[in-house]
Amino acid sequence: RNVNDYSVEEKNDQKSVRPHKKKKRKRWVMILIFAIEIILLLVLIIVWYVVGKLEMIERPAIDRDAIVINRELDDDTIEVLEGYTNILLLGSDARDNTVEGLNKLGENHTDSIIIASINNKTKEVRLVSVYRDTVLKFMDTANTQEVKYNKATDAMFYYGVESAISMINTNLDLDIKDYVMVNWNALIDIVDAVGGIDIEIDENELHWINEYLRDTGKNTGRSYTNVENTGMVHLDGIQATAYCRIRYGGGSDFRRTERQRTVINLVVEKAKNMDITKLNSAINSVFGNISTSLDVGTILNLAKSLASYTITESSGFPTEVTYVTTLKGNTSDRDFVLAKDLAANVTVLHKVLFDVDNYDPTPTVKDINKTISELSGAY
């Protein structure tokens, strides 16, 4: 055989191999495409599932044009505020156990008013409770523009959530546009979903937690077990809710708001370590008792960073207070909490929330401060 014969055979062998390689490559391409399709399908299922869960949340129509932000905020303040996501957290005393009952005018007060400020870069969270009995200016921003100077808790009662948000913005120079509001059932369920929390209970709290347990059980239809011991105690959902409601036994509303922030902190820390099964249980039980203005996309973005959130500040507003039992133009005698110089307290607030030194409040805040001083005669 000559060289040319071998050459022909080699070429024939090469021709016979090529179709096999093409078939193999085509099969791998098909497998890859199929795998990508499966992954996309799974992603779509997960998105559908999560969005479906989020749709359980009550989203009443909110008139964003009726949410007031002080126009006199200067450029530096606006720039600072844009670095944070500020949300108003509201706890309703609604006796109506339905989520629709959260937004009924003339029925519910916001016993818990908490400013949650999230640093968009560091994910640091700072919580400041506005004491419910603090005298602030609020108005019917959505309709009549009627103005009242009364307890902060009354804004929601008289005029609704737009008024409550606007009250915080105009009195404290903030830019809040969104809120999350829960009833007692939501708090009960979320604490139960994370497996309960451990709280230090003193003698006064032991008495009052059981008093509030009876009332909370009556109004929610939930069964409960009395707390028996002082010291470090493991509380279930309804016990933790009763703990958050305590106003007596020392510390009044100041101590109560501290309890509320403590419970939030403990729940967040436990939620960060929840497995998917428990997280799903929490979603199922809690979302049906929440009202919010946040859209699905915003909630998903916030949820993505849950593990990164760290609550680094927990305090109350105002920091310097005084008390009166009457206000000019207010016919009822009530225990009012006054910011001892509202403008000075707002300066402190901006340091606490945003690390701004020597903040100069807007003329609006200074005018409100002057009016409260005249109505109360306290400073």
Question: Residue ranges of each PLM-predicted region?
Answer:
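Amphipathic, coiled-coil-like alpha-helical scaffolding segments used for oligomerization/assembly
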Residues: T153-G221, N273, S293-D295, I299
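Extracytoplasmic
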Residues: E82-T85, N108-I113, N120-V130, S163, ...
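C-terminal solvent-exposed extensions
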Residues: N70-E72, T134-D140, I290-Y379
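Second-shell loop/turn segments in exported
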Residues: T98-L105, Y149-Y158, D173-D178, R247-R255, ...
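N-terminal targeting leaders characterized by basic, low-complexity, disordered sequences
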Residues: R1-K21
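Entry/capping segment at the start of metal-dependent catalytic domains
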Residues: R18-K23, W28-E124, N301
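Flexible, polar/acidic helix-loop-strand segments at domain edges
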Residues: E82, D189-K278
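Extracytoplasmic/secreted envelope proteins and their assembly/folding machinery
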Residues: T110-I113, V161-N169, W184-I188, D192-V194, ...
